[in-house]
Amino acid sequence: DTTDDDWEVLMGANARGVFNTIRSLLPIMAMGGSIINMGSVSGLNADPGLALYNASKAFVHGLTRSVAVDHGPKVRCNAICPGWIMTAMAGSAFAVAEDETAAKKDALARHPVGRFGVPSDIANMALWLACEESRFVTGQMFTVDGGLTAASPLNPSLF
């Protein structure tokens, strides 16, 4: 049930927006620097029912690698791939569930660290990627998800 308008909105923001930003940045980064894109665990592993979002974030990951290869050694380019980060947007995803409490409990159980992420978890990764300590890192996707993608999504109650 995806429309062309849905495609334009999602790919416009997540793909075209990142592409245009990088295209604008590269000429002024001749002396070097670090580009940090916002990917998603949904670009690494497809989430059901989110084909466009998954594809748009996979594009960001591919573009990140291409920029790293084409514009090194002076420009580094990496992406952060967040999992569940408790923001207003993430909270609204639970609000549409039949049982909001059960949905949160189920999602939380999939995080080996025992909590959802908070914005500072992502900010700390961005800080490291922006600084000189990460000077040997480029073309990588950094998953910041509390271990969400480390485990299989299989339901243990099936066994």
Language model features with spans:
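Residue(s) in the substrate-gating loop at a strand-loop-helix junction
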Residues: 40
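Active-site helix of classical SDR
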Residues: 22, 56, 64
